[in-house]
UniProtKB/Swiss-Prot annotation:
One of its GO terms (molecular function) is DNA binding. GO terms for biological process: negative regulation of DNA-templated transcription. The lineage of its organism: Bacteria, Bacillati, Mycoplasmatota, Mollicutes, Acholeplasmatales. It comes from Onion yellows phytoplasma (strain OY-M). It holds the Pfam family HrcA. Negative regulator of class I heat shock genes (grpE-dnaK-dnaJ and groELS operons). Prevents heat-shock induction of these operons. SUPFAM superfamilies: GAF domain-like, Winged helix' DNA-binding domain. This is Heat-inducible transcription repressor HrcA. Keywords: Repressor, Stress response, Transcription, Transcription regulation. InterPro entries: GAF-like_dom_sf, HrcA, HrcA_C, WH-like_DNA-bd_sf, WH_DNA-bd_sf, WHTH_transcript_rep_HrcA_IDD.
């Protein structure tokens, strides 16, 4: 079984993970013999490292004789061996100062907290607040003419969130601003009291296209317009800080990889995969098959947006990030973001 390691192997695995996190270099048995809590013969440590490699907890680095943790090794470490660095408590005061800025709206506090998280850890920080897209219903779709060719469409949710989209008509097409008002009324009747996520599916359905078939010359533009509004709702609660620091990494120097990574962030895939987790979660890029990065880790933890909804705050960084420091900062931040409801 995965947790059936001897105490000595546990100490060696913990030492490899934490030394690799601190120095970013493969760890050899000679280095481990100098650690005060590993008072074992060099041959014994070397033998156990070979066994840990055979068991899949460590892997050989091609450029040196040292070893680095594997996905399995990191997983075991995070589940069984992690001890939190109590020295990070000196950083909590700066978190308290951000959280106590009650004059800001909650969204602004989250943004400031993410910026601080990025500064404290040096990793990209992300958060999803209230899941407006999946938890809000359309209350009303309104149409406001501006002139004979321009108008504004408003979508208002039952939670009071509002998005608008400007629309311009091509005068060469056989549809007037008054025709458009009629079709928006049809859409309003069809989508009122539907969840935003449900409405997005309806808009793209054959049924919807048949419903507005009379306005075929404007059909594609209308569908694109509503999808743009729904996309705005979906991204309204998404926050980032320190993305540029990830883009400075050598493995992201390829423009095509940068494009994929940014698209990944915009689609919120990195956080969506963990929204159903109730506690601290970790995911490796190798196991996700989502990110263009190799050896990437995503650490996330939930916080209470309100008594009925949870958000998620996370850091994205290399798999060798300093877990004893990063995890207690994440945990403290999540607890205190939840207290914004008090």
């Amino acid at each position: 079984m995965m947790n059936m390691l001897s105490d000595r192997k546990k100490l060696i695995l913990k030492a490899v993970v934490e030394n690799y996190s601190q120095k970013g270099q493969p760890v050899g048995s000679k280095l481990l013999t100098h650690l005060p809590y590993l008072k074992f013969a060099s041959a014994t440590i070397r033998y156990d490292m070979v066994q840990l490699e055979k068991e899949g907890f460590l892997q050989k680095n091609h450029t040196s004789s040292g070893r680095v943790p594997s996905f399995k090794g990191y997983t075991y470490y995070l589940n069984h061996l992690l001890t939190r660095d109590h020295d990070v408590a000196c950083m909590f005061e700066s978190i308290d100062k951000v959280i106590q800025k009650k004059r800001f709206c909650k969204g602004q506090v989250i943004k400031e907290a993410l910026s601080l998280l990025n500064n404290l850890t040096n990793y990209t920080a992300m958060a999803i607040g209230s899941d407006i897209f999946n938890n809000s219903k359309i209350n009303k779709i309104d149409f406001i003419p501006l002139n004979s060719t321009q108008a504004v469409i408003l979508i208002i949710t039952d939670k009071g969130n509002v998005q608008h989209q400007n629309i311009s008509l091509d005068q060469t097409k056989e549809i007037s601003i008054y025709d458009l008002k009629d079709v928006v009324q049809v859409v309003n009747d069809l989508l009122t009291d539907k969840f935003l996520s449900e409405a997005a599916n309806i808009i793209q359905s054959d049924f919807f296209k048949q419903t507005i078939a009379k306005y075929i010359c404007f059909q594609e533009q209308l569908i694109a317009l509503f999808m743009e509004v729904f996309s705005s709702f979906a991204s309204e609660n998404l926050y980032f800080s320190g993305v540029s620091k990830m883009l400075e990494k050598p493995e992201l120097s390829n423009p095509e990889i940068i494009k994929k990574f940014m698209g990944l962030l915009e689609r919120k895939e990195l956080l969506k995969i963990m929204l159903n987790q109730d506690s601290l979660s970790f995911k490796f890029s190798d196991g996700l098959q989502l990110t263009p990065l190799k050896d990437c880790m995503i650490l996330s933890i939930p916080f209470d947006v309100n008594p009925n909804e949870k958000g998620r705050i996370a850091v994205v960084g290399p798999s060798w990030m300093k877990y004893p420091k990063v995890i207690p900062i994440l945990e403290y931040l999540a607890v205190h973001l939840s207290k914004l409801n008090d």
